[in-house]
Structure formats: structure tokens, C-alpha cells
UniProtKB/Swiss-Prot annotation:
Bifunctional enzyme. Involved in de novo dTMP biosynthesis. Key enzyme in folate metabolism. Catalyzes an essential reaction for de novo glycine and purine synthesis, DNA precursor synthesis, and for the conversion of dUMP to dTMP. It comes from the Eukaryota. This is Bifunctional dihydrofolate reductase-thymidylate synthase. One of its GO terms (molecular function) is dihydrofolate reductase activity. Pfam families: DHFR_1, Thymidylat_synt. DUMP binds at residues 324, 470, 488-492, 500, 530-532. The active site is at 469. Homodimer. NADP(+) binds at residues 36-42, 108-110, 129-132, 174-181. Its EC number is 1.5.1.3, 2.1.1.45. It comes from Plasmodium berghei (strain Anka). It catalyses: (6S)-5,6,7,8-tetrahydrofolate + NADP(+) = 7,8-dihydrofolate + NADPH + H(+); dUMP + (6R)-5,10-methylene-5,6,7,8-tetrahydrofolate = 7,8-dihydrofolate + dTMP.
Length: 587
């Protein structure tokens, strides 16, 4: 037997609170805890703006592209039952149904509970289920024609309307007896259910949901409004898509990879996005017109888009701040990226990166060096601006020789806790060799949860030319594979982060090889993520470039000691990239 809720896309939407005194009777909460929907003919709670906004968004939203699929499905039903030419337009149907809208169905009491200024619910076809209410009652109530309202006497009267009306979805919006009849007759496809997390006096309850038939399939964020928290859940009566079903070529079957997901999962995602802060969305709207190509890419699944999406989010929604350098930034706090090192080497392709410089700097760290001249002799200028006389003097390091960068990354990796004098001193066997220790743990105690390398030495911060940006990494071994997670406190999206992604990925490959493991995953956690003002225009260019497939990285398999690697032991294969983009470093 056909499921009419599926054919005609009939949903329920309701908000339920906890019932006062129920908490005292039972201390074991479950999905039935939230069941109160009315008291003395009105809502048990005072106006909740968040729930009202959600209700309006869900019941007003339409998707013209998805409607093609819905209409095709309904037409097939009509043809199958020889109804296509037999259904006449009901005289009660409003003329405005040529405009695609949703239908909302409610009982008489629910209609009467709506404030007059909101009647009828705008941009929706209002259907009232009542044996006693008459059309003239509605006209007289608001002194207008209320053409957007239809009165039916029974649930069965709804289906002739659904069969001959252009509509997107049909929502049952109350009250209790109406919900119950539709549920009892298996006429509800999904329930959009608001959980108002407070207790109120209630004399009307939502009917019990058959949890063998309906399962919770989506849960929203948690919100606060009118002195209570609330969230939104979706109960779904899931229907697997029949792979043999005839489907028109131009219809959309859903955004999820699993083929058994219904097409309207996309709508559910949109519903849950109802409360995006409009001011935030338009925060930096002066940049919005610059991302035509970026915005034309519908599914941004290439892993490089993790990085590009962060930049886009910061440029469009970031907070404008002054900063230490005087350049100024747009910034946001807290992101994460994951890269599968078993499949590719995440060397960004939307601009050409200086891979030799990345590797030389990493080898310099591994050797525990602090002498910037070593890098300059190799024409690697990453640290040049931080080693000048002016920069060191600004850090009150007047005694420090030019390009003596102090106890920075490599020194902390190899000599943590040792007393630093200058870049010429010999620190062999001084301090804690963290790098040696983590390699030993990976080899001999791989399940240890203390495989941590830390560059943030509070005692030494004032002695460093620049306190570390990427401050801590941890390693994880499972099934012969090594993963690394790195936390970065200060994240220069334009210049620094692309290098950091590549550097710690290479570092993971190197440690994996010397420990006889395979590289698995690099996870990058970003704290203060920022775009410098003088990088914005360059990054707009980068965002409008389409990523290429990532390259692969090959290491000399004969190297078994981390200190024995040289630049010639690294081969990047098939690095396809866009042109270099110049950006000035803010020092």
C-alpha cells in the first residue's frame, strides 16, 4: 500500500515543553519528557522568538529545484490511479496557488490561537480542519476576504486539495487531536519537533510518538530564548530510495553520499540554518562580489577547500582587529583541518609554494639550530625579517647578534630547559631532547598518550626573536600507522599556514619512516586564525582558483635516523599548481 505521507509530502511541526510537576514524579528523562503543547487555549510559554522564527522558516521555505521531483512523484501517483484527468479544481482553492507555497493544516482551536495580526499565516496556504467553522466567520473576523484560507471538514477532504493544488510541502501544525489523527492514520512523513527545555502548566499534550515507526535523525544546535534553552529535532519515517524507480534526469536526489537518504535532507539542512546571524553574514559584505568562481563550486570536497573555506569565512565574517604588527587583521577563533597522508601530500595547489624552503626550515628545526644565517646561506629567507637589528631591538634583545633567533622551535625540540647563551654555543646533551624521546616512545610504547613535542617554554619566551606560533604536536599510533595533531596559537592564513600544513605533514612522514610505520593523518588545529589586511586582495585571487590534485611525497627509504635526512632525500612527485602569489610578511 502506498504511503500517502510520502506521495504528498505531509509533515508535522510542533513545539513541546516539559509539563510542570512531571519532574517531581519521574527522574528518568526520555523522548516523552517534552510533550506539553497548550494550556487554556494558548501556548504554555510566553512568546519564544527563536521557535517562532524556526516555525516560520520551515513552513515558508520552498525549493523550486526540489519541487520538480515532488511534482513528478505526485503526477506518477495520479497517472497510476487514473486521477490525472478526473480531478477538478475545488472552488475553494485560491487563485494564488500558481505561486509555489507550502500548505499549513490546523484545527479550529489552533487557528483561533493565532493572533489576528498574523492571520492568515503569510505566504502559505492556510487550511482549517473544522466541522463548524464557516468561511464567513473568517471573513468577518479580520474584515477582509482571507482568500488564503480553505476550510475542510475532515482529513479525507484534504487529499482532493493536495491532488489539484500546486504546493511544495504540507505541514500539520496542530492541535493535539489533529496531530493524533494524522499520526494514527500513518499520514506523517517527518515530525519537526521543538524541545522547549522548561516546565509549564499544560492541559494539552502532543500524542505519543511511535518510536518503532519514527526515529530521531537530526538534532540542531542549542539556543537560548525567553529564559530557556531549546533545540530542534527531526523524527523521520525513513524511506529507502528504490534503485529501480524511474526518476527524471534533471531531478535532485539529495546531498548525502548514502543512496538511501531522501531528497529533502537538503531542506532539513536549510531549516537548521534558520538562525544564522544576518548581521554576521553581511559583516564584511564589501568583499562579497569578489568570489564568483569560488561560489560557483557547489561541492567543495577537495581537501584544499578546508584551508580555502577558512580564508573565505574570515574575509567575509572575521572580526576587524588591530595587531602587534600594525598592519591590522580580520580574525576568528578556532578551526580544524584533516589531511589523509596515506593518500596524498597536502602541498597547496592554488598557489606555488616554496617547497625547498619548507624542507630546509624543518631540517634546521630538527638539528636544533637557531642561527638564521644557515638558512640565508641556502637562500631561504623565512626568518630574515625576524633576525634584523631593528626587530631584535624591538624585542629588547639588544645583546643578541643579528640573525641569532634565540631558543626557538629547534632549540626547544632538542634542548628543552637548557640555558640559552647564543647561536654559537654547543648545546649537545643539554636539556631534554624531546624529539629523541617521542621517537623512542613511538617505537617502544606506541599506545602511550604522552607522545608530545612542545615548543612553548614560558621561561624562554622573552629570549626568542618570535615566540612559537605552532606550539605543540602529539602523535598517535594505530595499526602500523602514525598520525599527528598540531595546535597552532597564531595562524597567518596567507603566508604561514600553507607552510605549516606542508611542514608538519613532512615531519610526520619522516618520523613514520624512521619508526617503520606508515603516515596516516595530519590534523591541524588553529587558534587565532587571521588574514592580514595587506593579504586580502591576494587571497581573493587564490580563492577563485580551482585546486588541482595534491602531489605525493617520496622519502629516501634508506634513511633510518631522523638526523640523517638531507634536502636530496625528498622528492615531490606531480606537483601541479597555480602561479605564485606574492604577499608581504607582517613582522
Amino acid at each position: 500500500m502506498e504511503d500517502l505521507s510520502e506521495t504528498f509530502d505531509i509533515y508535522a511541526i510542533c513545539a513541546c515543553c516539559k509539563v510542570l510537576n512531571d519532574d517531581e514524579k519521574v527522574r528518568c528523562f526520555n523522548n516523552k519528557t517534552f510533550k506539553g503543547i497548550g494550556n487554556a487555549g494558548v501556548l504554555p510559554w510566553k512568546c519564544n522568538l527563536i521557535d517562532m522564527k524556526y516555525f516560520s522558516s520551515v513552513t515558508s521555505y520552498i525549493n523550486e529545484n526540489n519541487y520538480i521531483r515532488l511534482k513528478w512523484k505526485r503526477d506518477k501517483y495520479m497517472e497510476k490511479h487514473n486521477l490525472k484527468n478526473n480531478v477538478e479544481l475545488n472552488t475553494n482553492i485560491i487563485s494564488s496557488t500558481n505561486n509555489l507555497q507550502n500548505i499549513v493544516v490546523m484545527g479550529k482551536k489552533s487557528w483561533e490561537s493565532i493572533p489576528k495580526k498574523f492571520k492568515p499565516l503569510q505566504n502559505r496556504i492556510n487550511i482549517i480542519l473544522s466541522r463548524t467553522l464557516k468561511k464567513e466567520d473568517i471573513v468577518n473576523e479580520n474584515n477582509n476576504e482571507n482568500n488564503n484560507v480553505i476550510i475542510i471538514k475532515s482529513v479525507d477532504d484534504l487529499f482532493p486539495i493536495l491532488k489539484c493544488t500546486k504546493y511544495y510541502k504540507c505541514f500539520i501544525i496542530g492541535g493535539s487531536s489533529v496531530y493524533k489523527e494524522f499520526l494514527d492514520r500513518n499520514l506523517i512523513k517527518k515530525i519537526y519537533f521543538t524541545r522547549i527545555n522548561n516546565s509549564y502548566n499544560c492541559d494539552v499534550l502532543f500524542p505519543e510518538i511511535n518510536e518503532n515507526l519514527f526515529k530521531i535523525t537530526s538534532i540542531s544546535d542549542v539556543y537560548y530564548s525567553n529564559n530557556t534553552t531549546l533545540d530542534f529535532i527531526i523524527y523521520s519515517k525513513t524511506k529507502e530510495i528504490n534503485p529501480n524507480e524511474e526518476v527524471p534526469n534533471n531531478t535532485f536526489l539529495g546531498v548525502c553520499d548514502e543512496q538511501n537518504k531522501a531528497f529533502d535532507d537538503e531542506d532539513d539542512y536549510t531549516y537548521f540554518s534558520f538562525n544564522k546571524n544576518k548581521e554576521n553574514i553581511k559583516k564584511n559584505s564589501e568583499h562579497a562580489h569578489n568570489f564568483k568562481i569560488y561560489n560557483s563550486i557547489k561541492y567543495k570536497n577537495h581537501p584544499e577547500y578546508q584551508y580555502l573555506n577558512i580564508i573565505y569565512d574570515i574575509i567575509m565574517h572575521g572580526n576587524k582587529q588591530d595587531d602587534r604588527t600594525g598592519v591590522g587583521v580580520l580574525s576568528k577563533f578556532g578551526y580544524m583541518m584533516k589531511f589523509n597522508l596515506n593518500e596524498y601530500f597536502p602541498l597547496l595547489t592554488t598557489k606555488k609554494l616554496f617547497i625547498r624552503g619548507i624542507i630546509e626550515e624543518l631540517l634546521w628545526f630538527i638539528r636544533g639550530e637557531t642561527n638564521g644565517n644557515t638558512l640565508l646561506e641556502k637562500n631561504v629567507r623565512i626568518w630574515e625579517a625576524n633576525g634584523t637589528r631593528e626587530f631584535l631591538d624591538n624585542r629588547k634583545l639588544f645583546h643578541r647578534e643579528v640573525n641569532d633567533l634565540g631558543p626557538i622551535y629547534g632549540f626547544q625540540w632538542r634542548h628543552f630547559g637548557a640555558e640559552y647563551t647564543d647561536m654559537h654555543d654547543n648545546y649537545k646533551d643539554k636539556g631534554v631532547d624531546q624529539l629523541k624521546n617521542i621517537i623512542n616512545l613511538i617505537k617502544n610504547d606506541p599506545t602511550c598518550r604522552r607522545i608530545i613535542l612542545c615548543a612553548w617554554n614560558v621561561k624562554n619566551l622573552d629570549q626568542m626573536a618570535l615566540p612559537p606560533c605552532h606550539i605543540l604536536c602529539q602523535f598517535y599510533v594505530f595499526d602500523g600507522k602514525l598520525s599527528c595533531i598540531m595546535y597552532q596559537r597564531s595562524c597567518d592564513l596567507g603566508l604561514g599556514v600553507p607552510f605549516n600544513i606542508a611542514s608538519y605533514s613532512i615531519f610526520t612522514y619522516m618520523i613514520a619512516q624512521v619508526c617503520n610505520l606508515q603516515a596516516a593523518e595530519f590534523i591541524h588545529v588553529l587558534g587565532n586564525a587571521h588574514v592580514y589586511n595587506n593579504h586580502i586582495e591576494s587571497l581573493k585571487i587564490q580563492l577563485n582558483r580551482t585546486p588541482y590534485p595534491f602531489p605525493t611525497l617520496k622519502l629516501n627509504p634508506d634513511i633510518k635516523n631522523i638526523e640523517d635526512f638531507t634536502i636530496s632525500d625528498f622528492t615531490v612527485q606531480n606537483y601541479v599548481h597555480h602561479d605564485k602569489i606574492n604577499m608581504d610578511m607582517a613582522a
